[in-house]
């Protein structure tokens, strides 16, 4: 054990009450973490809906029902299309954001041609798989520092920032999404 681990061990085993408290906390920590994450993404969804209602009602906000699914997302779709949109993906893990399309529903050769033609005009341009625009947000809700950002006293403000970031990406690149929908769907 490291010196730090030895101190933790000594502190937690110094009395039955301390050990019991640590044990109770460790048994409930995952539930607390899950609630923090769910509450945060529901706040992002709420903030996105506010932005859509105030600024561009052509977008539709969709938050996956299972935030802990590996490819879970919080998306901005254009009108009723749900085959391509602006998305935060991996909501409970290593998050990314960008302009995404559902691969089997699109003509990839048309998308590849469009990517090459528009690469200097697309924010965070990408040729990565099902992404036209891609950015790793460097946030992972399996990490302590990222979880600190969504504690109740910070969650609403941070949700506004996350919503604003996705909304701005969507507004800046709306023409590219519209092109995909109108020209590349199979």
Language model region names:
Residues 117-186:
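C-terminal amphipathic "assembly/sorting" segment characterized by alternating charged
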Residues 1-11:
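Contiguous mid-protein beta-loop-alpha structural module that forms a pocket-lining wall or clamp
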């Amino acid at each position: 054990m490291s010196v730090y681990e030895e101190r933790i061990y000594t502190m937690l085993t110094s009395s039955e009450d301390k050990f019991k408290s640590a044990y109770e906390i460790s048994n409930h920590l995952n539930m607390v973490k899950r609630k923090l994450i769910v509450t945060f993404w529901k706040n992002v969804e709420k903030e996105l809906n506010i932005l859509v209602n105030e600024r561009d009602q052509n977008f539709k906000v969709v938050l996956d029902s299972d935030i802990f699914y590996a490819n879970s997302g919080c998306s901005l779709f254009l009108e009723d299309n749900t085959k391509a949109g602006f998305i935060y993906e991996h909501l409970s893990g290593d998050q990314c954001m960008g302009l995404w399309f559902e691969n089997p529903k699109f003509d990839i050769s048309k998308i590849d041609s469009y990517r090459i033609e528009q690469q200097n005009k697309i924010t965070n341009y990408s040729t990565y798989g099902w992404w036209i625009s891609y950015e790793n947000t460097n946030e992972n809700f399996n990490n302590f520092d990222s979880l600190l950002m969504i504690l109740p006293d910070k969650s609403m403000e941070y949700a506004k920032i996350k919503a604003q970031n996705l909304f701005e990406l969507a507004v800046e690149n709306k023409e590219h999404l519209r092109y995909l929908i109108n020209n590349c769907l199979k």
